[in-house]
Amino acid sequence: MKKNKIISYFHLNKSQIEKIEFFVAKIISYNQHTNLVGNSTIENFWDRHVLDCLQLSSYIFEKNLKILDMGTGAGLPGVLLSILGYKNVLMIDSVKKKTDFVKNIIKDLSLEARIQTKRIEKIPTVEKDIIVSRALAPLTKLLTYALLYSNKKTTSFFLKGRNVNNEIEMANKKFIFDFKVFESLSCGGGCVLQIKNIKTKND
């Protein structure tokens, strides 16, 4: 999907567009010395990254929900969700160069978001309403992490690729969970994987 169609689809206002453009420009500049995104994806950045992340807003209806972005990297999707007006986004990544980048973005754009430089399993186990992740780990590992911060009402949304069915099959060996698969709006044949009610099989 082209940039102008993405702007129209999500009804982005002038301020949101300017903030996203600033964010994208900073990623591309920073990417010259620190790997934030694959170089091959930069030319089609709005479809591959912006659209891929913004589509999560179609599933997260309340702006005040507590959101955990596991392994945020460049702030994808956490920064973009914050730009859309989600007010309680916590982003986690273990790589300081990446979290330093995101800290500066949060400051420059005056976003209501937080970033921590920690391994996911080391942050305080405060339950979250929504858990999101993109390009972090196979589903079995994501569920291991998500279970630490989930309650009966928590919903997770993982941006996944073509191999999602195999990942679900592998995860079913260790976990019981409810899931739905939604086709991604972005190019590349990916999907949005919705997960609820995670339990280990020996519970």
Region roles according to the model:
Residues 1-62, 68, 97-112:
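Class I SAM-dependent transferase core
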Residues 88, 112-114, 155, 176-180:
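Conserved beta-strand segments of alpha/beta enzyme cores
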Residues 103-104, 143-146, 169-170:
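Short amphipathic alpha-helical segments
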Residues 135-138:
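Short glycine-rich anion-binding loops that position phosphate/pyrophosphate groups of nucleotides
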